[in-house]
Amino acid sequence: MKIKPDYSKIGNGKEPQLTYDLDPKEPLAGDIITVKNAVLAKTPRSQGWRIAASVFDEDRNAVPEAVCWISRQQTATKPRTYPRENRIKELPGTWLYGGRFFPAFGHFLCETLSRLWALDHIDEPIEGVLFFPAYNEHEESAAQLFGQLAEIMDPAINYKICDEFYRVDKLIIPPQGSGVGRLLLSSPEMREYITTHLKRDFKPTGHDKIYISRTGQFDKVSSRFLGEKRLEELLEAEGYFVFHAQDHSWEDQMRHYQSATHILGPDGSPFHMVNFTGRADLNVGVIQRRPGPDAVQMVHQSNVYGIENAHAFAHLGRAWSSAGDRRAALKMVCEVKFSDLCKDLKERGFISKKAKWRDLTDTKIKQALLAQAKSAEADQRPVDGVDASLSDFPVCVKEGKPQVFLTN
């Protein structure tokens, strides 16, 4: 019979959370805890979206405050058992617990950085910041990402990836200050840390209006919306510079975002960095590219970081997905009604009053969908929502020759 731990004697004395409810107005600094002789343990073969990793106190109790969260309802770590004593390495000194190191750009900004705010709220010297790795091959990606972070923020982070079992003299564990979904709003300390430590002495680019495009190196099926190349042409005629963020250093990205007056683009992770600028004078427009709350949540993040004139532009039309899939959301691609988007952008001051845009014709849509079909190696069929199933349809009616069906 398993005995339930006495949580009144572990961490801050509270029961483990089933959800992580982060109030963007509620300070977290008072909830920082210190664990003596803490053991950090990640299961060696565990890697990916959720890893088996726990922090234990000197009585071998798992510390609930060290659980990492992706979103309000989804954890990034799952419990594991206390490691064998002879496999634990000693790591002297006092360290800050950073949570999970995840190498994807957006998750790095929103999750990996989510406890660094505590660096401004501890009054004792530390050796550095400890992270559990999401993937076992982490040396190159960690060096690259933390190096890029140092291009845009001071000071550089002295980090250590815990790919073995370690016992530290003292581990400072702050609450997680941000994440994805609702957690994008971040705690007050997290927002202050980002905006305070962000470098702001970059040389202006001369590009006042920027469109952050997804037509470059994004080869993931459903990463774009139909006709994005056409939208780029329309915006270039309005004076916008088409910017492929993934082709630029973080320093150059921030240089563009800090010197622009207007930034437009489909919802995606580059807007986290845009929002980190916290510029009250910046005009931000996030174009919804697929059903869901992403665009609105990105705008809410803009607002709490101090960007007052930020808007979500939701003008989706029809949607298609890959035949054979049980859930359309996995590979869904949508049309954006350019005529409605044009009206909205004019009203918000993002384009000139004389602009007149037309929706894509069915011929253009079919051309775009055919490229999607070849990329997905599956027929493209219309769907009426993210939960629609196309499992009753063969992947390809004509084997090896993906087609487009504008209607079923």
Where are these regions (language model features)?
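The feature primarily captures lumenal catalytic ectodomains
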Residues: 1-408
